[in-house]
Amino acid sequence: YPGSPGSYAVRLIFFDGEEAFVRWSPSDSLYGSRMASTPHPPGARHPVEDDHIPFLRGVPILHLIPSPFPR
């Protein structure tokens, strides 16, 4: 259990890409990493928030990753 003596926690973070228009500045592509690096508020019980909408069968999607659709 994370937080118990001798335990380790691993966090894998995959950020969505962002395209810059006209010019790329040092602040582009950092929105997700800035949010992930901010501390959680005191009393936060669950540091992970799942805000993804699950796949629905039969709904067309924009398929960007060249791999088979999960079944």
UniProtKB/Swiss-Prot annotation:
Could you name the domain of life of the organism this protein comes from?
Eukaryota
What InterPro entries would the database entry show? Answer: QC/QCL
A GO MF annotation of the entry reads: glutaminyl-peptide cyclotransferase activity
Q: Write out the GO biological process terms.
A: peptidyl-pyroglutamic acid biosynthetic process, using glutaminyl-peptide cyclotransferase
Q: Where in the cell is it found?
A: Secreted
Q: Which residues form the active site?
A: E18 (proton acceptor)
Q: What is its EC number?
A: 2.3.2.5
Positions of Zn(2+) binding: E19
- Catalysed conversion reaction: N-terminal L-glutaminyl-[peptide] = N-terminal 5-oxo-L-prolyl-[peptide] + NH4(+)
Kindly report the protein's main subcellular placement as a broad class.
secreted
A Gene Ontology cellular component where this protein is annotated is:
extracellular region
Q: In which tissues is it expressed?
A: Expressed by the venom gland.
Alphabetically sorted, this entry's keywords are: Acyltransferase, Metal-binding, Secreted, Transferase, Zinc
Q: What does this protein do?
A: Responsible for the biosynthesis of pyroglutamyl peptides. Has a bias against acidic and tryptophan residues adjacent to the N-terminal glutaminyl residue and a lack of importance of chain length after the second residue. Also catalyzes N-terminal pyroglutamate formation.
Instruction: Please give the PANTHER family that the UniProt record associates with this protein.
Output: GLUTAMINYL-PEPTIDE CYCLOTRANSFERASE
Would you identify the family this protein belongs to, as annotated? Belongs to the glutaminyl-peptide cyclotransferase family.
Q: What is this protein called?
A: Glutaminyl-peptide cyclotransferase
Please report the organism this UniProt entry assigns to the protein.
Crotalus atrox
Which gene is transcribed and translated to give this protein? Answer: QPCT
